[in-house]
Amino acid sequence: MYGFFKTMALAVVAAATVGCATVKRSAAPAGEKRCAWEKGRRERPVTTDAVLCYGGSHHRTPFLWDGKRLAPYVTYTDEEGREQWLFDGFIFLEFVDASRPDGRTYAFETGNRNAPAAGKEQWQELIAYFFAEGNCIDALDKSVAEAERRIGRAPTRRRVVVMLPDPVIHRMYADTTATTVYWGELDGRKLDFSRNEDRIAACKWYIDSVRERFAAGGYEHVELAGFYWIREIVTRPQDTEYSYHLTRSDIMLPHIAEYLHGLNCSLDWIPYYGSRGYDAWRSFGFDQVYLQPNYYWKPQNDMDDVFRRIGELGVGLELEFEPTLLAGRKGSEAFRERFRAYMRHAKETGVYGSRPIAYYHGTNGFYDLWASPDAEDRELFHELCRFIVGNPLRGERAE
């Protein structure tokens, strides 16, 4: 499998642009490079209920997001046998590639002190994974097509958001003596990530490569809505000198956001409660932002304050769970109660129906809940799906 995606990655370099203006590796304004679907947008697309789909790292089981795995995320069949559209957004993301056949590990974000940062080759492999036939985006497009044959046309194309790797300054994140010239070449020149313009150039190259592959796919049932910033903190000069020196988010992200906005694409982000920069998200250029309460793992977190901050900041909510809530797992009753607290607080505070929601479920938690034959798990699954399909925000956004 690794060899397949490595071979596929080579195609990223020479990917032909279909439906887009020729994407040159230059400083041309983003508006001059818009694809047909980007030109036709009146506004940047948003989602009401987006599910996080972690994939790309060899340590994950299952490894692929094929049609069989994606089907329960596309539609929901209720207790009366009625099939309905479920998630309208799919965020494909990864933060590390571990357990690789070559024995190496690469990090796609700052903060990893144990693995070297991914370079251009690993970024290409990640793109190849997302766009492989029968996987991720291609599988989603086909799954939606199959569902439309059963229940009719979806209200909107399912919206895809693809992660944007973090151009880590030093090859080893926390080692300031490690090289900053490790990523690879663009236009015949080795990039140096000590230079902000080179980090931005790498991100633009990745964005354009994803857009090219998406255009070449000819997808009819999904659209590329935007990109997801993988690091859960952003920094400003007032942060500690150490962390700011290693990230410099404030001088890079606004340029990336401006580029994406010129393409009518969004820049999305999911910081955790209390993380650096989460209260200044607009200054970095983010569009759709969700706050992680982390209550599922840290019940000491004050949910009343979390939802107060959501209201004050004008952001959405990330609803969080893992397979640890499945019946028979140690401590599952406590995890179920915490999970239900998210939905309860969302309704009581008015977040439900007014703010977008993202759904974290680990690697395969939602699928495991769907597949469980246990009566308690089935009850919880239906409760969650009713929460999603009944989201009042869908009607307001023509969903």
Give short role names for the model-derived ranges.
Residues 1-9:
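Bacterial N-terminal signal peptides that target proteins for export
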Residues 31-204:
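N-terminal catalytic cores of secreted or lumenal carbohydrate-active enzymes
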Residues 47-52, 86-92, 157-161, 223-228, ...:
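Structural preference for beta-strand elements that scaffold enzyme active sites
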Residues 85-99, 161-168, 213-240:
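Active-site groove signature of glycoside hydrolases
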Residues 156-169, 190-206, 224-231, 256-278:
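Aromatic-lined carbohydrate-recognition surfaces of secreted/lumenal glycan-active proteins
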Residues 206, 226, 234-252, 257, ...:
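Extracellular glycoside hydrolase catalytic/binding regions
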Residues 272-276, 288-399:
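Substrate-binding cleft of secreted/luminal carbohydrate-active enzymes
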